[in-house]
């Protein structure tokens, strides 16, 4: 610590674990920064996050715009950081505030430590039920919208022969009562196109059968996937 003071570092005492323990961080201006907006921090607590660091420096009068290296996960003991502030004057202000013997900051952690930290990390591997429900609802809305568009397309094709003379058979709800002449014409058409309709009924049955098989396969796949996820949740911390 004396060597750090000799090199121009200022000691800042912070409270850890609800003011039960003091921890020392050492600060110094980065003289190699031509903009004179950077600070060196030595011995940063291992559970420090970007949010915690920004809040602490702001209490000393500085506004952090960049942290190097990026903070991600648990830090190593005695971690060194370089932070860049908005204005050069803020560097002077932070060092001045930290150098006062009466200055001590509460270092409020936003996450648990020890076993609780690993439990939280494990739980984050799984999708939040609310987020999952919203995702499913959104997906079902898209499917419903697509089905409606498909029904409209099929309805537009109803009784319209294609290039080969085939007519797409589309099942609909209640049909309006037609005139006797229309009924007679429909009977004549049925006599002429009975074979075609039987052929299309067969196609529709096969298509429906295939769709049901696909749904069954997807159901089995999803069931196996859910089982795998349940097995993975057998968390053993020791």
Swiss-Prot record:
What is the role of the protein in this entry? Plays an important role in the synthesis of 18S rRNA but is not required for the 5.8S and 25S pathway. Is necessary for the cleavage at site A2.
GO annotations of cellular component type: CURI complex; cytosol; nucleolus; nucleus; UTP-C complex
In Swiss-Prot or TrEMBL terms, this protein is called Ribosomal RNA-processing protein 7
Where is the chain membrane-spanning? none
The record's subcellular location field reads:
Cytoplasm; Nucleus, Nucleolus
Keywords attached to this Swiss-Prot or TrEMBL record, sorted alphabetically, are: Cytoplasm, Nucleus, Ribosome biogenesis, rRNA processing
Q: Which GO terms of type biological process are on file?
A: ribosomal small subunit assembly; rRNA processing
What is the protein's major site of localization?
cytoplasm
The UniProt record lists the keyword Cytoplasm: yes
Q: Which family does it belong to?
A: Belongs to the RRP7 family.
The record ties this protein, via PANTHER family, to: RIBOSOMAL RNA PROCESSING PROTEIN 7-RELATED, RIBOSOMAL RNA-PROCESSING PROTEIN 7 HOMOLOG A-RELATED
